[in-house]
Regions:
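Glycine-rich phosphate/diphosphate-binding loops that line cofactor/substrate pockets in enzymes
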Residues: 61-74, 198-200, 243-250
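Ligand-binding beta-strand-loop-alpha-helix segment within the catalytic cores
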Residues: 134-216
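N-terminal glycine-rich anion-binding loop in soluble enzyme alpha/beta folds
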Residues: 2-62, 66-69
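Short glycine-rich or small-residue beta-strand-to-loop segments that form or flank ligand, phosphate
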Residues: 74-82, 104-106, 253-256, 286
Length: 336
């Protein structure tokens, strides 16, 4: 049987210099991903780095993170969004225990999610077209495609109140208060493992710049209502993270989402400079998110844009991953 003939390559009118330049530009091949019985997530991420589109960014981000974990670099995670309730809580716990993160800067909502599961409750899958009026009547809260029990969440509020009741009167940073929460959970009967406890046990500072905007703040407010003299001083936070940044030397940031945690983690450099500390700018970064850079919001702004603000080093090594954090985060490892 006669085989089909493939047409010849069309000719071109390119000059020799153009041909050389074209060959240079077309020298870095997009490699096809081959799955076999020996593949795991690490292998897949390595293959991604030679693919294209966001797969390449994911692979390059994983490679950059892996390389920096082998160096004396302090790594700050800036986390926002419903990451823990959506399934990334255990990865965060494991990353803390495996020395893959040195500082957490987070939204407070993450720690109401963390506390909810520490108390033995769960988050539950649902369809996005569920009747929210019915959910309200049933005291069920919805986060897009998953649910939580409002009664359980109120237990979370009351647990943070109890912790506030027991801490000595005083003025604290959010970092100190979260450390106290982790210590409290480590001694709590029947408490499940948690990010707070892991951070306490590994001496990882946790900063919540907007701590009033969550169950932690509600618990503290309830305690204050009954006469407790406890104040969370956000400016004390600023001073502490500035001092921390000045002492940590080389540093980089892993940004998931954006918002206040992203800005706070980056701004630690400026805070330290303004407080007359000798400080190095962040020299590597990875950002994972879906926000568009064109709307001018902080969450979507690139890590290179922050160079102009003096937050990141002019030679920062960074990777921007445009996509959902839940898909793109996997567990890293560190040699010590």
């Amino acid at each position: 049987m006669m085989k089909n003939k493939i047409p010849k390559m069309p000719s071109s009118n390119l000059s020799n210099d153009q041909v050389l330049r074209k060959n240079e530009l077309l020298s870095n091949e997009v490699k096809q991903i081959v799955l076999d019985g020996n593949h795991n997530v690490a292998n897949l991420l390595e293959d991604f780095s030679d693919a294209s589109f966001e797969a390449r960014n994911i692979g390059q981000a994983a490679k950059l993170y892996s390389q920096r974990l082998q160096t004396d670099t302090s790594i700050i995670w800036a986390l926002s969004g419903s990451l823990f309730s959506a399934g990334l809580r255990q990865i965060t716990i494991d990353a803390i225990r495996k020395n893959c993160v040195d500082v957490l800067v987070c939204t407070g909502a993450l720690f109401e999610q963390d506390m909810l599961e520490a108390l033995g409750h769960k988050h539950y899958k649902c369809e996005t077209n569920v009747d929210d009026r019915e959910l309200q009547n049933l005291m069920i809260d919805r986060v897009y495609d998953h649910l939580l029990d409002e009664i359980a969440l109120r237990q979370v509020d009351l647990t943070f109140k109890k912790i506030s009741d027991e801490i000595p009167n005083g003025i604290y940073s959010s970092r100190y208060f979260m450390q106290y929460c982790g210590e409290w959970l480590s001694k709590a009967e029947k408490a499940q493992d948690s990010v707070m406890q892991a951070a306490f046990e590994k001496n990882i500072p946790v900063f919540i710049p907007a701590i009033n905007d969550c169950s932690v703040g509600i618990g503290i407010a309830l305690s204050q209502k009954q006469g407790k003299q406890i104040i969370i001083d956000s400016i004390k936070d600023l001073r502490e993270i500035a001092l921390m940044k000045s002492e940590c030397g080389n540093s980089g940031i892993i940004v998931v989402g954006g918002g206040v945690p992203k800005n706070y983690a980056q701004d630690s450099v400026i805070m330290a400079e303004m407080l007359d500390y000798q400080v190095e700018k962040h020299n590597f970064g990875i950002q994972i998110g879906t926000e568009d850079i064109r709307d001018g919001g902080l969450s979507g702004s690139t890590l290179k844009e922050a160079i102009s603000w003096g937050k990141n080093d002019q030679e920062i090594e960074d990777v921007m991953v445009w996509g959902l954090s839940l898909i793109h985060i996997s567990e890293p490892t560190r040699p010590y």
